Each structure stands twice: as C-alpha cells, then as structure tokens.
C-alpha cells in the first residue's frame, strides 16, 4: 500500500509540474492506470479485466437489439413503398361501402341464366318472381348453353325422377336422364299433357282479364240496348243460360234473392173452376206467396228495389215521387177512407214503405197497362172480386203491407 501511495504522489507531482510549466499533458486512461497497477498488484488487474468484459458484453447486446429494431423499421418502410402505385399512377380516393354495389353484383347474369324452364311456370304458367325469374318462361325465352359436353359414361342410363314421378321435367331434351315415351313434348309426360294444357289455358284467360281491367280501369258496362227493362228483370228469375256479366252493375234484383215471382201466362183453374196456385218453392203456405194477377202487377218493392228504381237515370215514370214527380205526389193524395197510418198495425217503417210503393205502382203508367191487361184476361179480376180494378187506396196499401212484411 505504501508503494502505491508513493506512485500516485509521483504522478500527481508530475501533472502539477507540467501544468505549472504550461506543457499540456495527456490524460491517463484506466487501462494505463491498470497496467501501472498490474505491475504492482495482480489481483487488482484481474478485477478490472472482469469489469471491463462485462461492460463490453452489455454494450454488444444493446447494439444487437438496436440493429434488429432498425431492420424491422426498414422492412416496414420497404413494404409501404412497394404498396404505392407504379408508373406515377394516382391512387383512387377512399370510397365508403355502398350497399347498391352488392345488388349490382347480384344482378350480373350468370351463364346459366334462362337456360332451364321454370318449374312453377311449367306446372301452372304462374310464377311468383314474374319477370325477375332466373329461369325461362317458355321456349321463346330459353337461351342456348355454352357449356362444353363432358364425357359421361352414365349419360341416359337411368330414368328421370322428375319425369317419372311428377310427369314434368324442366330440362326437357337437355336432361341427362331418360324420358320414356315423352311423345311430342319432352317437358311434359303424355298423360299429363291435357291437364297441364288446361291450366295454361286458364292462366291465359286470367291474364287477359287482368290486362283488360288494367287497361280500361274497370269492366265496361253493356250498352243501354242490352240492358233489360227493370220490370222484366224483376218479373222472371235469372237462368243459367243468361251470363251474370249481362246483368246491370248494382244491387241484386229481388228475383235472385227472394221468392221468384213469375207473371202467369194463362189462367190456372182446377176442375171446379176455383183458382189454383203454382207449387211454392218455400216450405210455407203457398197461398202466402202465390199472387194473383192484380197483386202480381202491384207487387210491392223492397226499400232497396225502390231506391234502385228511383235512382235509375232512365226510369222515367218509375220515380218514387208520385204522379206529378214531386214530393207532394206521395203524401198529398186524396182518399175516400182513412189514411194508411190509421189502418196499418205494423211499424211506421213498413207503413211508409207501403205508402211509397203504393203511390209508385198506382201512379205508374206501366202498372196501369199491366192492370188493364190482367183485367181483360183474368175473369177473377172483376169489380165484385176480392180486389176491384180501382180499389181504395187504403185497401191497396194494406194488402201491400202484408206482402211487404214477408221481406
């Protein structure tokens, strides 16, 4: 320890003298200092070497980590540069997702578009997809296929399941299986051809009717010359030979929803000369429904029929306003007896309806002509009979009220 102290003192004195003399001196490195110490103490030299080695290892490890990090950054920069467009092309701006692009992609027609007959159309000529169907609706829409035929050893070696079970195959002649006895139509079996043809015919009729309604807006009404007279329509029932389309649009006539009255064409008498009635169609007393010529000519109209006749544009004298076609014609009548409201025991609604119907039929020129014809042809229609040709208005209203209650 004394030797080291003396050496340090000598070094300090040397530096002090050099600094005082103005001569620059180099700093002593730790290694030189270690050499000086090694000359004096070998244990101190070993400790210094171990410390320096550990420091060098730590520095090397840090340098390796820095190199790896720099290489990673460089590789990322190279990738970013390579992703840029080449040849001075400008990258398109960022576009947001448009849901219509997916729809456009779906609208792209594949090669198999309209190359096979639609199964639903083949069965009944109706398809829920209509024009948007991917399959052909008829041979006129059938497109040729561009798929090259492949070598298939099983071609036409088995029966077609669709053709044999259901009688229909949308592939027709292009089917890879056997269609036994297909006849003139390769899509439909011979025994199913009539049934399918009927379905197609009904579909064509339905399409024509829909097209007619869509073009005209509504079903065209028949001309006035083809429309029957209101009394003729009410006097006889509709027959199956008469199509419903010829009937005028509006409320259903009485003859189609109630007892079917028919004007007697000739007299009905039994052997004793008494008046007989035709068989009734209701399971009630026939005398309540079979009317004589007078009551038939003056059969009261229901409120619905009265409105129909009163609102018809060509009704003429069939208006419900009385003789002079004024409201006073109904209520302002003269009668030898009491008024209908005093004699009728039914409700006020039936009485009012009976009075209106009586005024309508009594004041109608057509009713008068029918009345005179009935009087001329029917011997029972006399002044002494149950109903006189010109009875009192009260009696006429009472009789009509009885029949009006049947409705």
UniProtKB/Swiss-Prot annotation:
Residues carrying Phosphoserine: 302
PTM: Phosphorylation by mbk-2 and by gsk-3 are required for its rapid degradation following meiosis II.
Mutagenesis / variant outcome for changing residue 172 to A: In te22; sterile
Basic and acidic residues biased stretches: 7-17
Recorded phenotype for the gene knockout or disruption: No visible phenotype. Double knockout with oma-2 results in sterility due to an oocyte maturation defect. The oocyte maturation defect is due to a meiotic defect in oocytes in which the maturation process is initiated, but there is no progression beyond the prophase stage of meiosis and therefore the cell division process is not completed. Animals also have a larger number of oocytes which are larger in size, but the oocytes cannot be fertilized and accumulate within the gonad.
Function per UniProt: Zinc-finger RNA-binding protein that binds to 5'-UA[AU]-3' motifs in the 3'-UTR of maternal mRNAs to suppress translation in oocytes and embryos. Acts as a ribonucleoprotein particle component that may exert part of its function within cytoplasmic foci of unfertilized oocytes. Acts redundantly with oma-2 to control the temporal expression and distribution of maternal proteins and thereby promote meiotic progression, oocyte maturation, fertilization and embryonic development. Recruits the translational repressor ifet-1 to the 3'-UTR of mei-1 and zif-1 to negatively regulate their translation.
Keywords: Cytoplasm, Metal-binding, Nucleus, Phosphoprotein, Repeat, Repressor, Ribonucleoprotein, RNA-binding, Translation regulation, Zinc, Zinc-finger
Keyword Manganese: no
Subunit structure: Interacts with taf-4 (via C-terminus). Interacts with ifet-1. Component of a ribonucleoprotein particle complex that interacts with cgh-1 and car-1 in an RNA-dependent manner. Association with many proteins is dependent on the presence of RNA.
Annotated effect of mutating residue 238 to A: Severely reduced phosphorylation by mbk-2
Tissues expressed in: Exclusively expressed in the hermaphrodite gonad. Expressed prior to oocyte division. Widely distributed throughout gonadal oocytes from the mitotic stage to the developing diakinesis stage. Expressed in sperm.
Gene3D superfamilies in the cross-refs: Zinc finger, CCCH-type (4.10.1000.10)
Zn finger limits (C3H1-type): 112-140, 154-182
One Pfam family this sequence matches: zf-CCCH
Gene Ontology, cellular component aspect: centrosome; cytoplasm; cytoplasmic ribonucleoprotein granule; cytosol; nucleus; P granule; ribonucleoprotein complex; ribonucleoprotein granule
Subcellular location: Cytoplasm; Cytoplasmic granule; Nucleus
Consequence the record notes for mutating residue 240 to L: In zu405; gain of function mutation and maternal-effect embryonic lethal due to improper degradation of the oma-1 protein in the embryo. Reduced phosphorylation by mbk-2. Severely reduced phosphorylation by mbk-2
Protein name (Swiss-Prot/TrEMBL): CCCH-type zinc finger protein oma-1
Gene label: oma-1
GO molecular function annotation: mRNA 3'-UTR AU-rich region binding; mRNA 3'-UTR binding; mRNA regulatory element binding translation repressor activity; zinc ion binding
Effect ascribed to mutating residue 339 to A: Reduced phosphorylation by GSK3. Severely reduced phosphorylation by GSK3
Region (Required for taf-4 binding): 46-80
InterPro entries, sorted: ZFP36-like (IPR045877), Znf_CCCH (IPR000571), Znf_CCCH_sf (IPR036855)
Biological-process GO terms, alphabetical: embryonic pattern specification; establishment of chromosome localization; meiotic nuclear membrane disassembly; negative regulation of meiotic cell cycle process involved in oocyte maturation; negative regulation of ovulation; negative regulation of translation; oocyte growth; oocyte maturation
Record note on what altering residue 141 to K does: In te21; sterile
Stretches for region Disordered: 1-39
